[in-house]
């Protein structure tokens, strides 16, 4: 069932409300999972750019209100929204902890993903699914998800991962949304 949280749509699934924003209808599809615990919509402008200017179909997924959910439950939340919207053949990505959820989702459901997009990389031990390309966008001054994490991940899959940098801290997607969007657009829409 659909519901409304502020100005965002949400779905109610097994008693939890999961907010999301669905924009655009282009052939290139991208699921973006928000960082946790930020009041601001850090990915909003970059996602809007991708939907309006690049012609992508972008699904942004937030977090249920209770913060005690496990990583697996958060993956289930994202899958529930993806299924509700009906997106297939998509890149899956996220910012900070949202990227960790995306990594876990793609690791467990690699058949549902065309690629993995990480806006900052948390230091977690989650294997990247075989044959999945990975784009990492890294803030040069990011101390929450430092460049060393991105470099360590890339070292495990050098043949199918790329790191692009943006001047800025952990909130680079909000402070430099168009630059973030252009990097994503050029990588995902190269063909």
Regions found by a protein language model. Give the residues of each.
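Single conserved hydrophobic/aromatic residue that forms the stacking wall/gate
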Residues: 1-11
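Short beta-strand/loop motif that positions the catalytic acidic residue
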Residues: 130, 136-138, 142
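Gly/Ala-rich beta-loop-alpha elbow adjacent to hydrolase catalytic centers
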Residues: 94-98, 102
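Conserved HGGG/HGGXW glycine-rich cap/lid loop of the alpha/beta-hydrolase fold
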Residues: 19-66
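Conserved acidic catalytic loop of the alpha/beta-hydrolase fold
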Residues: 75-90
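A conserved short beta-strand
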Residues: 111-123
């Amino acid at each position: 069932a659909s519901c409304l949280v502020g100005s965002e749509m949400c779905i109610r699934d097994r008693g939890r409300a999961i907010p999301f924003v669905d924009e655009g209808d282009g052939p290139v599809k991208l699921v973006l999972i928000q960082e946790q615990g930020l009041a601001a919509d850090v990915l909003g402008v970059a996602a809007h750019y991708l939907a309006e200017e690049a012609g992508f179909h972008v699904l942004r997924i937030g977090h249920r209100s209770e913060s005690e959910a496990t990583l697996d439950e958060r993956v289930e939340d994202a899958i529930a929204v993806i299924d509700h919207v009906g997106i297939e053949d998509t890149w899956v990505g996220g910012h900070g902890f949202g990227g960790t959820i995306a990594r876990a989702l793609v690791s467990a459901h690699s058949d549902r993903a065309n690629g993995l997009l990480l806006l900052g990389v948390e230091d977690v031990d989650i294997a990247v699914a075989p044959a999945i390309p990975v784009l990492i966008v890294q803030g040069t001054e990011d101390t929450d998800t430092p460049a060393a994490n991105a470099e360590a991940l890339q070292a495990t899959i050098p043949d199918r991962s790329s790191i692009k940098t943006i001047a800025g801290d952990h909130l680079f997607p909000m402070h430099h949304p168009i630059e973030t969007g252009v990097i994503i657009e050029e990588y995902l829409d190269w063909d």
